[in-house]
Amino acid sequence: MTDLKNSKTEENLKAAFAGESQANRRYLYFAQKADIEGYNDVAAVFRSTAEGETGHAHGHLEFLEETGDPATGEPIGSTGDNLKAAIAGETHEYTDMYLSLIHISEPTRRS
């Protein structure tokens, strides 16, 4: 078996994981809107579909355990590793990502 790390397959799994994860969150958002508008049956369909997307995303992530967290590159799999990866991801968000986005957005806000 060839190494998954730095392969086209790893790249594809990361892209598929991101797509399935985003679909899950969109469908949950759509379900919430359907609930607010009184479409309870539609909301239930969105939630069921979101759960399916979760299963797909988890399947991709299971393969990616071999190469690490797709967001941080940290090892994942055990609870200890998962906690470290989650902390690394959240730390990146508040120390780098959002600060960078603020600096990029500032000129737009001023125009």
Q: Which ranges hold each PLM region?
A:
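Single conserved hydrophobic/aromatic residue that forms the stacking wall/gate
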Residues: I102-S111
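Divalent metal-coordination and catalytic microenvironments
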Residues: E20
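Acidic/His metal-coordination segments adjacent to aromatic residues that form catalytic metal sites
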Residues: T2-N12, G68-H92
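Conserved alpha-helical segments that form or flank metal/cofactor-binding pockets of metalloenzymes
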Residues: N40-T72
